[in-house]
Amino acid sequence: YFSALAKKFIPFGLDSKMLIRGIWTGTKAMAENDGSITNEKRFWQSFALFMGQDILRLAPEFDKFYMHEFNNAKQMVGFTPLAHTCTQLLKDKGYRLIAATNPIFPASATQNRLRWAGVDPNIFDFITTYEHCTFCKPNLGYYREILQKAEKAPGDCLMVGNDVNEDMCAAALGIDTYLITDCLINSKNKDISTYRHGSFHDFYQFVQELPSLNEASKSNEEE
């Protein structure tokens, strides 16, 4: 990712090490965002403060990068067909889907990352990206924003993820959770026994056993 980014912007006269430090500075600012402005605005404020205001004229080039060259990072990302299988089955059963990925990227980049995983971005009701979110994981404000936008109570939702710190923290709000352990991220070495957890195949079996909301809705209509 960073090597592709540097390669893209060296022709514009940017120092690659300075650029990468600037990206990290902007990313840190987003991670500490307080809900007052979007992550996008927070990133560009911090990035421009670090790099100089002239960097703002290259904003369209960054958009192009995330739409095109960013895809070169696909080879570094794991893939399982079960990601598509599970999301499609949930959709077919009538569940609303939200791609609750850490909103540190623009929409174009996040949609590409979903495609790398074999998942159609259009299957989701909405996707959390830096244009619309004002918090990042693991700030609980991030999950509160999702609940507000989805108009759902915590008990009506399930957060599925592989990061113990960033995804399972949703349980603090009363959101049910499922920790996928195939590519487990547990930077703080937390005890995962308190969370429902299993492999992607285990999760697929879990999804198969979930009731169909379509059938429940049809039954209520008949009554």
Language model: regions and residue ranges:
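A cross-family glycoside hydrolase active-site/sugar-binding cleft signature
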Residues: A100-N102
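Short, acidic loop-to-helix structural element flanking the phosphoryl-transfer center
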Residues: T38, R42, L56-P60, M67-I98
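Active-site neighborhood of HAD-like aspartate-dependent phosphohydrolases
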Residues: Y1-R21
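Short, contiguous strand/loop micro-motifs
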Residues: A31, N72-K74, L97-I98, T129-Y130, ...
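Asp-based, Mg2+/Mn2+-dependent phosphohydrolase catalytic module
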Residues: H84, Q88, I104-F105, T110-E223
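A metal-dependent, Asp-based hydrolase signature
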Residues: L14-M67
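Short amphipathic alpha-helical segments at helix boundaries and their inter-helical linkers
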Residues: T27-K41, F70-G78, C133-Y142, A171-D176
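Glycine-centered loop/turn motif at secondary-structure junctions
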Residues: I10-G13, G52, G94, G118, ...
